From Swiss-Prot:
GO terms for molecular function: adenosylhomocysteinase activity. Its EC number is 3.13.2.1. SMART domains: AdoHcyase, AdoHcyase_NAD. It comes from Gloeobacter violaceus (strain ATCC 29082 / PCC 7421). This is Adenosylhomocysteinase. Its main location: cytoplasm. GO terms for cellular component: cytosol. Substrate binds at T62, D134, E159, K189, D193.
Length: 428
């Protein structure tokens, strides 16, 4: 990937442009682990399928996202990037995108809520034809505050489980009037990004924030979807005793048959040394649970928004708050017991660490890139609704990834193809 050093002619709001050189090196390092996206970028640069298309992307501003942004620009898009989380921005990456690639970026690590919302408005002022969203904040804000822009939107792509839940609610309410691609539901996304990416990066963030030993700890994982499965798998591999809380009986059975303890949060609250929420819902850990926790219990979140842990209630129960390490805040409750909160209750893997490894984001962002291309190719043909990534694109990404990994697999023989398409062969 070649950086284009030209006079800066784009709008931006980043921490420090002098960080660009460091960001450039890290973006190029991540690119080594993203061979699928590299191949798409090469094709895009020749075919220019997104020429002139205005894209507003609301994503975590990381080295992996930078490679997606560069691929979109190579495809001819007029892309603008804002952060999807106040704590997830990597300031050097933001600087490099502006300086080296001429991409407008509005993202500051640690930005307050007012700044974040202002950046969402900047994304809408771009008058996007395509919205790449991570939690559906841009889409939701447009529907509520800028309905004048809706007619110009070709479609949106959504990266997260949380965002797809919001899109489904919008569709049910009759306010989603354009097509949305459920990138999260692609097999090459959630099987790998959600499970292996979240599992590894969540524990990475916890360890960076606390430097605790996980072996022998009782870790309570709230939620056993793909993200929860990944967190539980890696925690168990580090020697922790894992307890799962769930509301879905099928997932609870899965956890039990995976050899994990399953119980309500009301029972787990007094057992856990470390609590990790990965549900996508609000107040999974709340007032009554804090009251039951051990002294020094650690709580953190790896779901999308900072609402899974009821920090307002914890603040009301506390007589004192103090930062004891970066991203590590101690709440002292009335009576002297303490509860430790990591990363302000935001995504701990991005607040205290670097997010998912580039290798899994390679497939996730290949899905994003192909989803955008699919929306453009099918402009005017898709009714309002939520669409899965076409199976042929999902399989194409998987095949490219396997080839990059040097792995070959079998193909069906003519006899096998005939058998699975017939009904008259059975017991011989």
């Amino acid at each position: 990937m070649t950086a284009v050093k030209t006079p800066i002619q784009v709008r931006y709001e980043v921490r420090n442009l002098e960080l660009a050189a460091e960001g450039r090196q890290r973006i190029e390092w991540a690119a080594r682990e993203m061979p699928v996206l590299k191949q798409l970028r090469q094709r895009f640069s020749q075919e220019r399928p997104l020429a002139g298309i205005r894209i507003s992307a609301c994503c975590h501003v990381t080295t992996e996202t930078a490679n997606l942004a560069v691929a979109l620009k190579a495809a001819g898009a007029d892309a603008l990037l804002i952060a999807s989380n106040p704590l997830s921005t990597q300031d050097d990456v933001a600087a490099s995108l502006v300086v080296d690639h001429g991409i407008p970026v509005f993202a500051l690590k640690g930005e307050d809520t007012a700044t974040y919302l202002r950046h969402v408005r900047v994304a809408l002022d771009h008058r996007p034809q395509i919205i790449i969203d991570d939690g559906s904040d841009v889409v939701a804000t447009m529907i509520k505050d800028r309905p004048d822009l809706i007619a110009g939107v070709i479609g949106t792509t959504e990266e997260t489980t949380t965002g797809i839940v919001r899109l489904k609610a919008m569709l049910a309410a009759g306010v989603l009037t354009f097509p949305a691609m459920a990138v999260n539901d692609a097999e090459t996304k959630h099987f790998f990004d959600n499970r292996y990416g979240t599992g590894q990066s969540t524990l990475d963030g916890i360890i960076r924030a606390t430097n605790i030993l996980l072996a022998g700890k009782t870790i309570v994982v709230a939620g056993y979807g793909w993200c929860g499965k990944g967190v539980a798998l890696r925690a168990r591999g580090m020697g922790a005793n894992v307890v799962v809380t769930e509301i879905n009986p099928v997932r609870a059975i899965e956890a039990a048959m995976d050899g994990l303890q399953v119980m309500p949060m009301a029972e787990a609250a007094c057992l856990g040394d470390l609590f990790i929420t990965v549900t996508g819902n609000k107040h999974v850990i709340r007032r009554e649970h804090f009251a039951m926790m051990k002294d020094g219990a650690i709580v953190c979140n790896s779901g999308h928004f900072d609402i899974e842990i009821d920090l307002v209630a914890l603040g009301e129960l506390s007589s004192e708050r103090r930062m004891v390490r970066p991203f590590t805040e101690e709440y002292t409750l009335e009576g002297g017991k303490s509860v430790i909160v990591l990363g302000e209750g935001r995504l701990i893997n991005l607040a205290a660490a670097e997010g998912h490894p580039a290798s899994v984001m390679d497939m996730s962002f290949a899905n994003q890139a192909l989803a955008v291309e699919y929306l453009i190719k099918n402009q005017g043909k898709l009714s309002p609704g939520i669409y899965n990534i076409p199976e042929e694109l999902d399989r194409q990404i998987a095949a490219l990834k396997l080839a990059a990994m040097g792995i070959a697999i079998d193909t069906l023989t003519p006899d096998q193809l005939h058998y699975i398409s017939s009904w008259d062969e059975g017991t011989e």
